[in-house]
Amino acid sequence: MLKFKNMYITSHDNFIAYIFFTFFTFIPFYRSDQSTLCRCSQKIFLSGQRLLRQTVIIVGPLAPFSSYSSPFFFIPLFFSGPNSIPFQDYRCSPWCPSRSHGAVLPSYCSLRWSHRT
């Protein structure tokens, strides 16, 4: 247990942080034809990526104090880089609802639309 500015940070807290940031890192991998909220805006993705990077910089040094997350805490960074393979061309892809189906799309979906038939 580590006492940090009158706050007790335990390995359990670090484990929760690891699960939290890993979950939000891999959210863009969720692809469903029925998804009405297609994640097709680079702006939204990059803002989340920036928040993740800043948080890891702040919370990361605490990871060695955790027996759970010390070797695994930085794994999400390998998947959130700007040149990472899954997100090199991050835009609307065929799994997004098509306009011809009358789907109500969020406004940001029209920013980078590339629906292919």
Swiss-Prot record:
Protein name (record): Putative uncharacterized protein YLR169W
Membrane protein topology class: Multi-pass membrane protein
Localization per Swiss-Prot or TrEMBL: Membrane
Taxonomic lineage: Eukaryota, Fungi, Dikarya, Ascomycota, Saccharomycotina
Record's keyword annotation contains Membrane: yes
Chain ranges passing through the membrane: 9-29, 56-76
Organism: Saccharomyces cerevisiae (strain ATCC 204508 / S288c)
Keywords: Membrane, Transmembrane, Transmembrane helix
Gene Ontology, cellular component aspect: membrane
Other remarks in the entry: Partially overlaps APS1.
